[in-house]
């Protein structure tokens, strides 16, 4: 469990580093400041959709309660699951871009996860869509106030989005043991 935690923190750190670099790129700053425009929404969908796919590929495969060493997850066996930062990316995309961006990134991430395989993976599509929509509606409320979400608010939203994902896993994943 400690090993999985450390590996997941590495993945979260990578996402934070990429986000930090993007926020400091002037072009991306302009996209964020004009996030209500459709052209900006499309760009945010492409950027966060790519991040979500990267999160799926760099996830940690778990089979038979063991971490399976992999560098890039292109396929999962039917008895394996994956620990990744996909839900974090979907939540952030919704907070930043609103419900259109969040739900579209959720669909991209969910369908990509289904393509990866693994047991009973189809529930990731509606789960990711719901996460994107909820985070998006919360993000759009913040945008109307012309503020970006604080770190604390984002952390709480992220935890809630992960809980939604876990509820879907609990009810729809079946027995993976």
Residue ranges and their predicted role:
Residues 1, 8-9, 38, 142, ...:
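Detector for methionine-enriched segments
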Residues 2-91, 101-102, 106-177:
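Hydrophobic transmembrane alpha-helices
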């Amino acid at each position: 469990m400690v090993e999985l935690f450390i590996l997941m923190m590495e993945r979260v750190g990578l996402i934070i580093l990429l986000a930090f670099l993007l926020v400091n790129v002037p072009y991306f700053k302009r996209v964020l400041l004009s996030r209500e425009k459709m052209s900006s929404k499309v760009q945010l969908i492409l950027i966060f959709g790519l991040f979500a796919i990267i999160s799926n590929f760099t996830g940690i495969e778990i089979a038979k309660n063991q971490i399976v060493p992999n560098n890039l997850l292109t396929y999962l066996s039917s008895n394996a699951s994956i620990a990744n930062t996909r839900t974090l990316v979907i939540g952030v995309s919704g907070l930043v871009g609103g419900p259109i961006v969040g739900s579209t990134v959720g669909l991209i991430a969910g369908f990509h996860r289904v393509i990866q395989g693994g047991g009973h993976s189809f529930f990731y599509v509606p789960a990711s869509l719901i996460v994107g929509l909820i985070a998006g509606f919360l993000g759009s409320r913040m945008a109307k106030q012309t503020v970006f979400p604080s770190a604390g608010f984002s952390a709480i939203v992220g935890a809630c989005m992960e809980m939604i994902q876990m509820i879907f896993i609990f009810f729809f994943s079946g027995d993976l043991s």
